Amino acid sequence: MATFKDACYHYKRINKLNHTVLKLGVNDTWRSSPPTKYKGWCLDCCQHTDLTYCRGCTMYHVCQWCSQYGRCFLDNEPHLLRMRTFKNEVTKDDLKNLIDMYEILFPMNQKIVCRFINNTRQHKCRNECMTQWYNHLLLPITLQSMSIELDGDVYYVFGYYDNMNSINQTPFSFTNLVDIYDKLLLDDVNFARMSFLPASLQQEYALRYFSKSRFISEQRKCVNDSHFSINVLENLHNPSFKVQITRNCSELSFDWNEACKLVKNVSAYFDMLKTSHIEFYSVSTRCRIFTQCKLKMASKLIKPNYITSNHKTLATEVHNCKWCSVNNSYTVWNDFRIKKIYDNIFNFLRALVKSNVNIGHCSSQEKIYEYVEDVLNVCDDERWKTSIMEIFNCLEPVELDDVKYVLFNHEINWDVINVLVHSIGKVPQILTLENVITIMQSIIYEWFDIRYMRNTPMVTFTIDKLRRLHTGLKTVEYDSGISDIE
């Protein structure tokens, strides 16, 4: 049983404020939600279990029970998850406010302890205190958090997360902020709470506290496409696809890290809850993470033999050729931009090969093929440039004044001609390595200009950013045949 979840269940009965703040979906009637096999900690109830995707950010961070309330750590409504979420620079005063909130919501005194002990129905002698009966009293106050970095902003979701060594398939990593506060001050807070417990429970409380307050922070994870809902990934091939998200909002006027102070003024807190509402947004999937996902999918389907072939058709339109025919049944080809990039890249590469190397048929086995497999993966800059350099070297370049040149005198299509004119100002007869890199980047950047793309999708934006973009009609950046350059 998750300690934080149990504490919320029992403590929500002590007053009206707690009944509102500590209400968790996991402690209420179960409602069905999409099942998944992702393992990790639910940010809402802090238990380690199977996770489903959040309706606010499409990432996997909520359990199937808590998903019924649709809470996200990026919300603007002061629910418990939002009040436990801190952003970027966290100060000692911020952590003091967090500890004060814990003390208000989970008080520990003689009256509370006696009340819980008397209300507990034990199956053995009442004089014997067992941890499974009093799990809710064994919630220490720690500065343990799950952190994530989203486009330069770092979020810390504080809580009490059991079983830290369990499988974690989420983009969140454990971070300990006790050094920002003060170990001794935090010790005093917990020793004072522990003193009200029966002697048989004090040792367990101490073990839990020290294990969660003295651990070494994990290295922060990189967010990738696998951390987002499979429903989003399955529709990436559609250029006009928009992600539907919902956010819980209110007229929250505090600074981000001061939301936890709201519980100190109960009447003001309930007044703010009266302004709570749900906002709906349709946002674009355009970002580096999803772009790299699509380009990698296309890279797996590459037929490098086309660059030595004599086919009169475009690379994606070759049929009945054992070495060059692309399997068009994959959904990645439904995105016309991917097909354009693939056709133009291979039209340009074939012109380079035919201009410099005497290879007459696509059935021949050439060393250059092994370097062609990475020509679409421009998001991995170092690996991509290495593959282009190896391709260039396979063309047997001529060195003149420490600069290597290759010929370029084979026919190309009109799309590639336009790219050449825009990128280097003319259709040249010779090319350097830098020219080749520039041209191939331009072919890809025409449709996916990753230089100006955010890393994560807009679903990870805060409410303030979403509102500003919505006002400027920029939340839906779908393409109707319009490229990045246009």
Curated annotation (Swiss-Prot):
Post-translation changes: The C-terminal region is phosphorylated by host CKII/CSNK2A1. Phosphorylation of the DSGXS motif is essential for host NF-kappa-B inhibition.
Chain segments carrying region Important for cytoskeleton localization: 82-176
The keyword RNA-binding is assigned to this record: yes
Keywords for the protein's UniProt record, in alphabetical order: Host cytoplasm, Host cytoskeleton, Host-virus interaction, Inhibition of host innate immune response by virus, Inhibition of host IRF3 by virus, Inhibition of host IRF7 by virus, Inhibition of host NF-kappa-B by virus, Inhibition of host RLR pathway by virus, Interferon antiviral system evasion, Metal-binding, Phosphoprotein, RNA-binding, Viral immunoevasion
GO biological processes: symbiont-mediated suppression of host cytoplasmic pattern recognition receptor signaling pathway via inhibition of IRF3 activity; symbiont-mediated suppression of host cytoplasmic pattern recognition receptor signaling pathway via inhibition of IRF7 activity; symbiont-mediated suppression of host NF-kappaB cascade
Residue window of motif IKBKB-like degron (ILD) motif: 479-483
Residue ranges, annotated region (Zinc-binding domain): 42-79
InterPro entries, sorted: Rotavirus_NSP1
Signal peptide start and end residues: none
Localization (cell): Host cytoplasm, Host cytoskeleton
Interaction with host IRF3: annotated segments: 317-486
Stretches of the chain forming a coiled coil according to its record: none
Gene Ontology CC, one term: host cytoskeleton
Chain segments annotated as transmembrane: none
Keyword Zinc belongs to the record: no
One of the record's GO molecular function terms: metal ion binding
One of the Pfam families matching this protein, by short name: Rota_NS53
Principal localisation: host cell
Domain remarks: The integrity of the zinc-binding domain in NSP1 is important for degradation of host IRF3. The pLxIS motif targets host IRF3 for degradation; however phosphorylation of NSP1 pLxIS motif is not required for its activity.
Subunit structure: Interacts (via C-terminus) with host IRF3; this interaction leads to IRF3 degradation. Interacts with host IRF7; this interaction leads to IRF7 degradation. Interacts with host CUL1 and CUL3. Interacts with host BTRC.
Function: Plays a role in the inhibition of host innate immunity by inducing the degradation of key host factors required to activate interferon production such as IRF3, IRF5 or IRF7. Associates with components of cullin RING ligases (CRLs) including CUL1 or CUL3, which are essential multisubunit ubiquitination complexes, to modulate their activities. Recognizes the host NF-kappa-B regulator BTRC through the presence of a DSGXS motif in the C-terminal substrate recognition domain.
Protein's UniProt name: Non-structural protein 1
